[in-house]
Amino acid sequence: MSDIALSISMLSLVAVLGLWLGNWRVYGVGLGIGGVLFGGIIVGHFAGLSGLALDEQTLHFIQEFGLILFVYTIGIQVGPGFFSSLRSSGLKLNGFAALLVLLGCAVAAALHQLFDVPLPVILGVFSGAVTNTPSLGAGQQILAELGAAPGSTGLMGMGYAVAYPFGICGILLTMWLIRMFFRIKIDEEAAQFEQQAGKTKESLQTINIAVRNPNIHGLMLSEIPSLDEADVICSRLKRGDELMVPRPDSRIELGDLLHLVGERHALRKVLLVLGEEVETSLSTRGTDLRVERVVVTNEQVLGKKIRDLDIKQKYDVVISRLNRAGIELVPTSQTSLQFGDILNLVGRLDAIEAVTNVVGNVQQKLQQVQMLPVFIGIGLGVLLGSIPFYLPGFPAALKLGLAGGPLVVALILSRIGSIGKLYWFMPPSANLALREIGIVLFLAVVGFKSGAGFIDTLINGDGPAWMMYGVAITLIPLLVVGVLARLYGKMNYLTLCGLLAGSMTDPPALAFANGMHPTSGASALSYATVYPLVMFLRIISPQLLAILLWAGA
């Protein structure tokens, strides 16, 4: 059997064993995708005993490519809501994340001083305890720059391997402990997040208004200031017994009934200008008007503004709502269309069919993955992650790495939506499949590599002490920040789980958190919100620790 065939066969065995272990549940809690790590340790241990060795280059490629797939698909998933989340809660989330990193550094420095732990060992344990591979690389590089002994990098690697498994388990344990201590109900937390995110009760509102203001009489719809604003849409007009679709040049008369769509505060402002709210129904039922939902799939309209399509004038159809990535938006004339946008159309059936032909509404396209943008995004992400950033006073350059680069690029591209005929939309099922494959590959290799020397390190020498140092570095910051964020920050539990996973740059923990409520994007959103800053801090922190502790030695 060739080296590549043997490597793939062994990793498949690791995945099967690990996923089986992950399905075991104790009191309703299981390892989930994290079981693959322990499947890898078990298989790696017995492979080491039998003298079986896999090709290092193949393993390294599979590990890194799996990680790239995982973080890229996470970025594509949360990108549309990432920047709005950053504006609304980014400061709070990143503040807690920075505190967690700072506490971890403080615990590591204290252990080094109190127990006289060698600097390479504590740096390796620190990197493993926070499950951050770039941190390990940065630490090894700074030790070489400082002139440490040649065996220092090996010591760091051993410390990393010993601390890494509990680094993952510690996050899962912290999530479980917080859930038990605060008696949290997952479904209630998910519903609360949806409400706060504006996806349920706080979504767009509708109101029927009777025109009572004589100053409005005779004005065209486009001449009424309150209706010309970007946050209110007039989708229906009833005059007497006739229900019609209003056009910008439609003249308003006293007694007209208008059906408006918008945010609650905007509708209240319009109500004060136009007249009074009425209970009269403006339903299209029994009339020649229809309300239909169509999906934007036509590549020709991607990136175009609604005003450029001139739908109101050409087809006498109003777009009353726009749903993008589960969030309802007011479809203004300045809104650019993206692939997968869901439009609410109001108009006559033949006119709606004409607009449908313009925007696409081909359901099969929603199940297809455009592969060219995927590899463009991954390639750009790898390039960004490889760019060195030089800071004054640091002997080594800083990089986002293969985990940070693809994530940042995916966030930006999914927010842009489309460029020409290229669109960064991925069906949820395809996104989930690629994400799960990526994290399984990554964990399988990490576990397999750690398995060979794992038991020996634990049983002989200082292995148990190193593991306890790792436990302290993992648990103390997580528990302190977790309790503070929940108790004083009043943070949603699913958001908190994403914060903890992101603060430890731990994809398996995010996969575990996502599994608690698969339909909620709360954990992934907070993970992506803190990840860029945390990755930067995780790369800097071992270098700062090395410089400070080396100087104090």
UniProtKB/Swiss-Prot annotation:
<keyword id="KW-0812">Transmembrane</keyword>
<dbReference type="InterPro" id="IPR006037">
    <property type="entry name" value="RCK_C"/>
</dbReference>
<feature type="transmembrane region" description="Helical">
    <location>
        <begin position="29"/>
        <end position="49"/>
    </location>
</feature>
<feature type="transmembrane region" description="Helical">
    <location>
        <begin position="439"/>
        <end position="459"/>
    </location>
</feature>
<comment type="similarity">
    <text>Belongs to the AAE transporter (TC 2.A.81) family. YidE subfamily.</text>
</comment>
<keyword id="KW-0472">Membrane</keyword>
<feature type="transmembrane region" description="Helical">
    <location>
        <begin position="493"/>
        <end position="513"/>
    </location>
</feature>
<dbReference type="InterPro" id="IPR006512">
    <property type="entry name" value="YidE_YbjL"/>
</dbReference>
<feature type="transmembrane region" description="Helical">
    <location>
        <begin position="465"/>
        <end position="485"/>
    </location>
</feature>
<feature type="transmembrane region" description="Helical">
    <location>
        <begin position="158"/>
        <end position="178"/>
    </location>
</feature>
<feature type="domain" description="RCK C-terminal 1">
    <location>
        <begin position="191"/>
        <end position="276"/>
    </location>
</feature>
<dbReference type="InterPro" id="IPR050144">
    <property type="entry name" value="AAE_transporter"/>
</dbReference>
<feature type="transmembrane region" description="Helical">
    <location>
        <begin position="371"/>
        <end position="391"/>
    </location>
</feature>
<feature type="transmembrane region" description="Helical">
    <location>
        <begin position="95"/>
        <end position="115"/>
    </location>
</feature>
<keyword id="KW-0677">Repeat</keyword>
<feature type="transmembrane region" description="Helical">
    <location>
        <begin position="533"/>
        <end position="553"/>
    </location>
</feature>
<dbReference type="InterPro" id="IPR023018">
    <property type="entry name" value="Transpt_YidE_put"/>
</dbReference>
<keyword id="KW-1133">Transmembrane helix</keyword>
<feature type="transmembrane region" description="Helical">
    <location>
        <begin position="65"/>
        <end position="85"/>
    </location>
</feature>
<feature type="transmembrane region" description="Helical">
    <location>
        <begin position="403"/>
        <end position="425"/>
    </location>
</feature>
<dbReference type="GO" id="GO:0006813">
    <property type="term" value="P:potassium ion transport"/>
</dbReference>
<feature type="transmembrane region" description="Helical">
    <location>
        <begin position="4"/>
        <end position="24"/>
    </location>
</feature>
<keyword id="KW-1003">Cell membrane</keyword>
<dbReference type="GO" id="GO:0008324">
    <property type="term" value="F:monoatomic cation transmembrane transporter activity"/>
</dbReference>
<dbReference type="Pfam" id="PF02080">
    <property type="entry name" value="TrkA_C"/>
</dbReference>
<feature type="domain" description="RCK C-terminal 2">
    <location>
        <begin position="279"/>
        <end position="361"/>
    </location>
</feature>
<dbReference type="Pfam" id="PF06826">
    <property type="entry name" value="Asp-Al_Ex"/>
</dbReference>
<protein>
    <recommendedName>
        <fullName>Putative transport protein AHA_3492</fullName>
    </recommendedName>
</protein>
<dbReference type="InterPro" id="IPR036721">
    <property type="entry name" value="RCK_C_sf"/>
</dbReference>
<keyword id="KW-0813">Transport</keyword>
<dbReference type="GO" id="GO:0005886">
    <property type="term" value="C:plasma membrane"/>
</dbReference>
